[in-house]
Amino acid sequence: MEVAILFILVIAMLMIGVPIAISLGLSSIFFLLTLSDTSLASIAQSFFQAMAGHYTLLAIPFFILASSFMSTGGVAKRIIRFSIAVVGHFPGGLAIAGVFACMLFAALSGSSPATVVAIGTIVIAGMRQVGYSKEFAAGVIANAGTLGILIPPSIVMVVYASATDVSVGRMFLAGVIPGLLAGIMLMVTIYIIAKMRNLPKGDWLGWNEIFASAREAVWGLFLIAVSYTHLTLPTNTVV
């Protein structure tokens, strides 16, 4: 009976438009306060005891928060501008730049959905404007977004390392080469398809634009350098 009431509360909140996270949280709190003998204090204590020895998992919510800040704070736009300046002049340049931007953002966010949302919302619209098909643009970003869990730092790697008691740093190092190879192979494939289909390419913007866009994206690129040189622990890095 209690379980049925809990499900009814969640579904009712979802039907009136309450966000999923808030629906789950409020229904659980209401259930604990009214229908359960367990106190909220004991739940907090149990959670703390479960986290003991697995402090690396604290990096996960910080990665999610950091990716949200970078998506809304303009870091994604600066990375896209830098990517277009570097590779946008090749055949299929905007698509290749989208993959390159996904690789850079993946090295910051550690999440595939965050990478797709941050880069895809900008790049797909740009690709459609210059003549790419909707299917091709969506396919490129969908494939490039998967690099978010392969190129370190990765949330999946943090969870696996914590569950198996292996080094997070070693997990990150193990994902560098496969992630780079996957990204490069995807860019080469786009280049070949662009040559065969005569897809649009951008103009060479010059070294001044590369340096100018790099200066704007410097803090995002600096965070990548910090993560890959292991100057801090994973949790400290994302903070």
Language-model regions: role of each:
Residues 1-234:
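Alpha-helical transmembrane segments of multi-pass membrane transport proteins
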